[in-house]
């Protein structure tokens, strides 16, 4: 298969695409891939590191207020469409996949206008602006949350899940030991993190809850975010940190460690939810209030309704609420087991295979 992929700006658009490519290369080793991203997006670092060819173009989003910048946005979009058409004609993809971000708008629009099979993948429960725009032009739509289905006008909408789910599910036999992080094997473990940058409100709640965490029969690994580690350690100065608590800047090799986690505290981003449901990890979700259309709350609610997670809204988060919910999970194995089963029931551990099937359907329909 010759696959062109476009998605960028944030990891939530990039990592699912890379997970899909990784799986496609496993089942079809001769697959050729061209990734098209934005000049200033995270993809400029992540995609080349993964070993794939990357082409970039300049794009930007619309301002909500009247602004001359919106004139520039239209100009850049039209310029990007022209660039994308040239790339498509040169690369000759069998299918083009968009995973969100402004750059995918130009690339998928160009592909549709050239009559190339097109598929978009929506990771969240609230459909992004770019995918809403593209829905009327593309051949197939793939979703990771059932709530997204009604937001698309097309009949050809397929639930696939998020490819990151399969990538994580394939690593369940990792030989990781908690001793590598200064903790013990065989002790129930809860992991707490607020994303790669960390989340100040989550960090503050953990600092407040630390005296209680120190006394628990379970152990805690807490990632502050690289940029916030010094601040957190400063706030903890003079406080004893129990042998059952490990504070780190960042969780390295997350896919290898997640299968060994008994519970998780995290934001409610699409990638995180895909990972925890693929593995069936009981989770306390703290949705970020700083995202478009409050989509993390909707993501979290989808799991809470299924008994697959607990949720604490950020304005209700403090040390007391955090330790109360953590103890509810960690000190009752039956509660954890039930939530783990519910979580796994809504997961998609074969998400990449499902999305590959959608790509192949788009190609086959085009050839009829």
Curated annotation (Swiss-Prot):
Intracellular or extracellular location(s): Cell membrane
Keyword check for Transcription regulation: no
Catalysed conversion reaction: Mur2Ac(oyl-L-Ala-gamma-D-Glu-L-Lys-D-Ala-D-Ala)-di-trans,octa-cis-undecaprenyl diphosphate + UDP-N-acetyl-alpha-D-glucosamine = beta-D-GlcNAc-(1->4)-Mur2Ac(oyl-L-Ala-gamma-D-Glu-L-Lys-D-Ala-D-Ala)-di-trans,octa-cis-undecaprenyl diphosphate + UDP + H(+)
Xref: CDD domains: GT28_MurG
GO term, biological process aspect, one: carbohydrate metabolic process
Entry's transmembrane regions: none
InterPro entries from the UniProt entry: GlcNAc_MurG, Glyco_trans_28_C, GlycoTrans_28_N
Binding positions for UDP-N-acetyl-alpha-D-glucosamine per the UniProt entry: 10-12, 124, 196, 251, 296
EC annotation from Swiss-Prot or TrEMBL: 2.4.1.227
Keywords linked to the UniProt accession: Cell cycle, Cell division, Cell membrane, Cell shape, Cell wall biogenesis/degradation, Glycosyltransferase, Membrane, Peptidoglycan synthesis, Transferase
Topology versus the membrane: Peripheral membrane protein
Broad class of enzyme this protein falls into: transferase
Source domain of life: Bacteria
Pathway given in the UniProt record: Cell wall biogenesis; peptidoglycan biosynthesis
GO cellular component: plasma membrane
GO molecular function, one term: undecaprenyldiphospho-muramoylpentapeptide beta-N-acetylglucosaminyltransferase activity
Protein family per UniProt: Belongs to the glycosyltransferase 28 family. MurG subfamily.
HAMAP family reported for this sequence: MurG
Purpose: Cell wall formation. Catalyzes the transfer of a GlcNAc subunit on undecaprenyl-pyrophosphoryl-MurNAc-pentapeptide (lipid intermediate I) to form undecaprenyl-pyrophosphoryl-MurNAc-(pentapeptide)GlcNAc (lipid intermediate II).
NCBIfam families, per the entry: murG (TIGR01133)
The name this protein goes by in its record: UDP-N-acetylglucosamine--N-acetylmuramyl-(pentapeptide) pyrophosphoryl-undecaprenol N-acetylglucosamine transferase
Organism per entry: Limosilactobacillus fermentum (strain NBRC 3956 / LMG 18251) (Lactobacillus fermentum)
Encoding gene, per UniProt annotation: murG
């Amino acid at each position: 298969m010759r696959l062109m992929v476009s998605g960028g700006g944030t990891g939530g658009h990039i990592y699912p695409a890379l997970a899909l490519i990784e799986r496609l290369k496993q089942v079809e080793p001769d697959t050729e891939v061209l990734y098209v991203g934005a000049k200033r997006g995270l993809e400029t670092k992540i995609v080349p590191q993964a070993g794939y060819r990357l082409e970039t173009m300049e794009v930007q989003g619309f301002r909500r207020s009247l602004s001359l910048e919106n004139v520039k946005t239209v100009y850049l979009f039209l310029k990007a469409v022209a660039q994308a058409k040239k790339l498509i004609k040169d690369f000759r993809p069998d299918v083009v996949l968009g995973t969100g971000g402004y750059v995918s708008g130009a690339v998928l629009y160009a592909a549709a206008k050239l009559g190339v099979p097109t598929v978009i993948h929506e990771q969240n429960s609230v459909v992004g602006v770019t995918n809403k725009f593209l829905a009327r032009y593309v051949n197939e739509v793939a979703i990771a949350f059932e709530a997204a289905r009604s937001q698309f006008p097309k009949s050809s909408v397929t639930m696939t899940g998020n490819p990151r789910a399969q990538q994580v599910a394939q690593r369940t036999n990792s030989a990781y030991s908690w001793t590598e992080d200064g903790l013990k094997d065989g002790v129930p473990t809860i992991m707490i993190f607020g994303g790669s940058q960390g989340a100040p409100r989550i960090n503050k709640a953990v600092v407040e809850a630390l005296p209680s965490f120190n006394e628990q029969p379970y152990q805690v690994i807490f990632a502050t975010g690289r940029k916030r580690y010094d601040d957190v350690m400063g706030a903890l100065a003079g406080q004893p940190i129990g042998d059952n608590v490990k504070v780190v800047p960042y969780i390295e090799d997350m896919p290898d460690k997640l299968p060994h986690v008994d519970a998780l505290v995290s934001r409610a981003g699409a990638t995180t939810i895909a990972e925890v449901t693929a593995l069936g990890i009981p989770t306390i979700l703290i949705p970020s209030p700083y995202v478009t259309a409050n989509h993390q709350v909707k993501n979290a609610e989808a799991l809470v309704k299924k008994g697959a997670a607990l949720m604490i809204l950020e304005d209700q988060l403090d040390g007391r609420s955090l330790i109360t919910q953590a103890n509810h999970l960690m000190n009752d194995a039956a509660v954890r087991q039930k939530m783990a089963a519910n979580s796994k029931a809504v997961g998609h551990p074969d998400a990449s295979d499902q999305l590959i099937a959608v790509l192949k359907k788009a190609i086959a329909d085009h050839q009829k």
